[in-house]
Structures are given as structure tokens and as C-alpha cells.
């Protein structure tokens, strides 16, 4: 995190509508029910590997909705649906992983949210820290430098 700007600090200042959190919690609860005993037989049998094709298909369907004649504004309902399908895949994969012990690579959707939030804050020090980048080109350059450093740090951790 950049100069004391943690994700909790950032979230506190964002004013995320309560409705957003409620809807997300509902989605997670529905997936929990689908994967639980007495839930859906098909959903309960899925693995990361079996779900990959659906994630790819849904991502392509988002692209199609964006590129459709008239653009995303003309097809907002379709785009909402397709983005929901991609979000479902994130929640689904997270739920599958949650069923595994943490020591064996398990995680939950809160871990995914924490990781992406931290990454966005870390890669935007011009917004959340003391760095400056006022043009899109400067932002892209800074982003590339931060991403390269993250790769180097990951490689060093693997070698350790």
C-alpha cells in the first residue's frame, strides 16, 4: 500500500451504496445454497476445471454486447446480463475454492475482493498515494512500472 493508504481507508471514503453490498451478499448466499447439500446437483459437481469454458464463453459474450451495433448504451440490459454472468463465474470459482482448506489453496470471495481492491489501490498511487500522473500516458507508464515490480517481487518470492 502506498504511504499508509490501506484498503479500509479507501473503502471508508468511497460511499458505496448499501444496495450494492446487499445485492452482492445475496449472490454469494444463492451460490452457497446451490453448492450446499440439498442444493443443485449440477452446481455441486462443478470444479475450477469444468467451469473454465463457461468463464471464457461469458467473457466473449460481454465483448459481443459491448461491440453490438449501437454500442453498450443501446444494449444496456444485455450488457448488465452478461456482466452478471461473468460476476457469477467469479463467485462460483470462489465458492469452489472455499470448500478446500486454506492450507491446500482454499480461499473465499472476500479474499478475491480484498486482493483486487489492494491491487487497484497499489496500482493507482496517483489517486490513493503521493505520486502524480495526470495524463493517460503517464498513468499507463506508472501502471507498467508497478506491474513489472510486482512480477519481480513474485519471482523473488518463488526463488526464496
For the regions a protein language model found, what residue spans apply to each?
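Flexible "arm" and connector segments at domain edges
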Residues: 1-83, 88-160
Amino acid at each position: 500500500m502506498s504511504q499508509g493508504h490501506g484498503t479500509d481507508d479507501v473503502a471508508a471514503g468511497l460511499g458505496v451504496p448499501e444496495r450494492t453490498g446487499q445485492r452482492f451478499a445475496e449472490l454469494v448466499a444463492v451460490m452457497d445454497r446451490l453448492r450446499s447439500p440439498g442444493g443443485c446437483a449440477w452446481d455441486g459437481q462443478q470444479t475450477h476445471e469444468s467451469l473454465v469454458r463457461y468463464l471464457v464463453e461469458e467473457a466473449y459474450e460481454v465483448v459481443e454486447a459491448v461491440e453490438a451495433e449501437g454500442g453498450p448504451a443501446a444494449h444496456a440490459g444485455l450488457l448488465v446480463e452478461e456482466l452478471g454472468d461473468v460476476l457469477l463465474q467469479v463467485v462460483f470459482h470462489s465458492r469452489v475454492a472455499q470448500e478446500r482448506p486454506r492450507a491446500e489453496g482454499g480461499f473465499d470471495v472476500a479474499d478475491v475482493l480484498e486482493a483486487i481492491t489492494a491491487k487497484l489501490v497499489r496500482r493507482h498511487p496517483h489517486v490513493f498515494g503521493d505520486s502524480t500522473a495526470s495524463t493517460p500516458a503517464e498513468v499507463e507508464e506508472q501502471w507498467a512500472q508497478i506491474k513489472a515490480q510486482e512480477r519481480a517481487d513474485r519471482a523473488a518470492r518463488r526463488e526464496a
